[in-house]
């Protein structure tokens, strides 16, 4: 447990001092617990999401960094994207089978920025309605169905 807390403290400082572009740690979210963070995000300039504001929820288990964090969009504005379900779940391989303890909150944030920035058309995943009706509340317990090369 102590190594998890040390790692989270280190990542928290890194996110506060050098956040990825368009990302800001919601300071209130970490006041009561170091195991649940909210990161405020703004869509990158020149993309379909330019100026849009989103929130990412990170939840860390006691096995972090050996287990990936649970990461999902939360709040009023969930991006419309082929790999983001309307309940906020994100289909991104580094959040599941491609996770490595060498990855960090910053690398997850950068991957999500990249995923949104490369989007050519705002649309939901093809199975959005079915998935949202039948999925587990924890996206880490999802067996993802791949619709293209990445998800």
UniProtKB/Swiss-Prot annotation:
It catalyses: S-ubiquitinyl-[E1 ubiquitin-activating enzyme]-L-cysteine + [E2 ubiquitin-conjugating enzyme]-L-cysteine = [E1 ubiquitin-activating enzyme]-L-cysteine + S-ubiquitinyl-[E2 ubiquitin-conjugating enzyme]-L-cysteine; S-ubiquitinyl-[E1 ubiquitin-activating enzyme]-L-cysteine + [acceptor protein]-N-terminal-amino acid = [E1 ubiquitin-activating enzyme]-L-cysteine + N-terminal-ubiquitinyl-[acceptor protein]. InterPro entries: Ub_conjugating_enzyme, UBQ-conjugat_E2_core, UBQ-conjugating_enzyme/RWD. Pathway: Protein modification; protein ubiquitination. Its main location: nucleus. Homodimer. Interacts with FANCL. Interacts with STUB1/CHIP. Its EC number is 2.3.2.23, 2.3.2.25. This is Ubiquitin-conjugating enzyme E2 W. The gene is Ube2w. It is found in: Nucleus.
